Amino acid sequence: MRRALLTGIQCHACRNNVVRSFVSVSGVTFMPLASGSWSASQTRPPPLSRNFSSQHAKLFSSHPSDNAEVAVDPMPEKDITEETVKPPEEPEEHIPWYLQEELEATTSHPLRKQQPLPPLPENPPPILNGLLEHISIDLGLDDISLLDLRKLDPPPALGANLIMIFGTARGVKHLNVSADRLCRWLRTTYKLRPDADGLLGRNELKIKLRRKARRAKLAKSAKSTLTAPDDGITTGWICVDVGTVEGGQFRKPEEEARKVGFVGFGTFVQGTRIVVQLMTEEKREEVDLEGLWRRTLERNSLENEGLPQPQAEEPPQEAGDIHKPSSVTPAHISHRVSHAAQISVNYEQRRGISTGSCQYRDLEEDGLNYAPINPDGTIKLPELISESTPLTSLTSRLRNISPYEAIYHLGQDVNDTNSTTFLEQFYRKLSKAPDDLASAQRIKLICIAIMLHHPGYGKTDLFKVTQEHFISNYGVTPPQFLEILDALLSFKPDLTSDPPNLLLPAADMELALQTIDHVGLRGIDLLNSTVWMKLFVGASFRVPVCPVRDLMNAPVIGNRTPVSLDTYETVNRVQTRLLKVKTAAKIELSANEYLSLLRVLFDHEWYSMFWDTWEEIALAGMPRDKSLYVFLFQLHAESDGWEGWKSTLLNCIPMMERENPPVYMDRELAEVIARCLAIAHPEIMDRVERNEPSPLVRLWHRCRITIEKEVPLRGAQNPPSTMS
């Protein structure tokens, strides 16, 4: 297995097989993705003839042959004489081929259907349509998108009434040539003065490339390598400022001047400013400038409309009885609330709800926010959208409210389209949108509902909609693929069942693998840290476990849940194969991904692999800062069964001050270290009372002094009970 990975990892087909290789061990049956039914006549092209004979010419000729019978309608003699009287028409003058005017092809190129132009925004400037066609057709840029930033208030630093266009070049040379031709085309056609940041002139690019090749040749002859990371050529990003063009502004200067309370100075901006961002594919994924502007635009629209913001709360209101909405039955409400409690909301405070109704007691236990009451007794929920809200921002509004309100706005099930105001307006805008955008937004809506554990939205519904999206040959972006994968791999363990349900169902894993297989055929990179980490966590236990032979009579060990030895070994075989894939593909993890990997290894009691991964973080050149050490000691303080590795854990304490930058002990670290000492050495209090001259006692006194001296920023807190 290891040799096959190392030798065949460069092949695209082998990459797909590597990702799916651990499925056979876990017992999941992999079925190929269903595709549309195509006949053999559609997939097999007709044979081509070598030459065009006269027989083929006769088939397409409009003149009848000599042997064919011609049916002639009887005509009056008067008409015949009139025709004979008419003088013969003069023959048309022959025009040579080099003097004939070239006619543009009326049929569009088939590749244009694969990459359509983005739709024009409201009130576009006249130049915009021609500019998009020139960028796509003449320059050959891919993945063109458009952001309308004219409604940003305050305007961005590039200027007011801004429209930003993004395009992907095939390489560095194509990037420079496209930017140069775009500037020349704007100067010639529209008499504009564009400014291109990062553009190298034609001769300058050739000179730098020639010098770079010469330096590489000299370095090769000297048996050395070029260490300069930035040579000034491979920036991969050129920003072309087209300038201010006529038309496209939303408000006229006279209307701005008449605004009440308008204070300012300077001149009004007339017209629209257009900026074209040209990047290579690698630079566009690295910078994600488009995503940054989209989030800024969505946040600005929320602020302007006065909608609730993330991590914000409304002022407290007078509590009262909660009644069900008029369109939802009590059974549905109670069922939805129980599912909504599974999503933790990151609010600074949580308020309980005082109510006498038994069927809504879950609201108080879950600590959800207070829902105000209408005069007629129905629940008053905030309006999510308005008529001016763009379609791409609708689903994002669901993430900015509480889970209970989001589940209410999502209606009964996946087929519900008009039970709530949100669904009614969402599907109305969906019917007017392009087919590919409508399909992508519907997938996003179902993904959010599954992550909220809505009872009416299932993973089979998501897979069905995703399958239709693939068969329709719509585009799939890496963020969209990761969102689908998160929804398919989402799972909440059930500790109340007998036996406890701690693993993702095999059917859900099969749906995720089929989606991965089809996305890999579209050219999306699968052997990266993000996809690998999602598969690794998805195939693992979601709580700390301990393997036992007799599950019925197994004792409880701390916070660990006993599982059968066969299930534990099956999961470990899958995890071992995934770890081999990571090593063979040389996948580099980020700091947050290392934290997830450490937690999974610790929950599975893989302590040897756990400490190897801890050392791997330092070998990868990542700083092990205070947050990482707090996570390490907190992980051990919340669980048992690691006492055999207590010396390894305690050796990390003197290593903290040797880190770069060093990590010094404060109150937060001292508290978790003291808890770990109490678990690893239960007799530590007796040693402290006897005042033994041991390193453990000195470490205990050091933690106690740090806790007593340092006052936390949030106010004084009592020391842990183990210190008393």
From Swiss-Prot:
Keyword annotations from UniProtKB, A to Z: Membrane, Mitochondrion, Mitochondrion inner membrane, Transit peptide
Gene3D superfamilies noted in UniProt: Beta Polymerase, domain 2
Biased composition (Low complexity): 308-319
InterPro entries in UniProt: Atp25, NT_sf
Entry coiled-coil feature ranges: none
Intracellular or extracellular location(s): Mitochondrion inner membrane
Annotated stretches, region: Disordered: 36-76, 300-323
Domain of life: Eukaryota
GO terms under cellular component: mitochondrial inner membrane
Function, in words: Probable mitochondrial mRNA stabilization factor.
Family (UniProt): Belongs to the ATP25 family.
Protein name: ATPase synthesis protein 25, mitochondrial
